[in-house]
Amino acid sequence: MQKRSAAGVAEPHRTHARHGLVRSPRPNLGFERYDECFIARWPFPVRRVDGMGEALKIGITGLPGAGKTYCLLKVIEMLEADGLKVGGMITEPIVKRNRREGFYVMDWATKEKRVFASREIQSKTMVGRFSIDISALEEVGVNALRSATANADVIVIDEVGKMEVESPNFVQSVKDALDADKPLLLTLHKKSRNPLLQDIRRRDDVRILEVTMVNRNLLPYKIVKLMKGEVL
């Protein structure tokens, strides 16, 4: 039976084009369920990149260890296999004796990397138990984002988290990348209330997907299909 709006007008059911499934109308909460992940609606037309659909901006969030970076790297692998130029920054943990001792920041295009967070370096900027080398973050990460915004087909940012937002130049580079007319993938700290993260979550032009231990192997393929315009 069709539902009716407050004005008495029947609301049509929505049909999933691929599977032929009928979805009943739901309250407009700004998110849709797609298998195991929630996806924010994308209402605006944007520029297309050859080999892809709309120039989507997708934020991947999740609990620590859920697989945000793993998911992002799998998407990058598939995009590059399709001949797309991916640029931006990636962070890598430094693990010694099964203990996380810090993080590298890496320019994905050039593979240049430096330690930017560590228990061992001296810095006035501390986040938790790590000292933050702002200059290393900016010389590698921020420059990578600027280059990707200008030259890459797809921009990647891993991650927008508590340590990275200590750099005003990083914050501005993320904003510039978000405003660029290019596809963008970024990983987001799940719980931080930093103003930049809050702004990203509120943006109408960013889809937020949550990775979990259950969907981490499937989600990269869904993201690529979203970026190619094969699913809505």
Predicted features by range, described:
Residues 64:
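The conserved Walker
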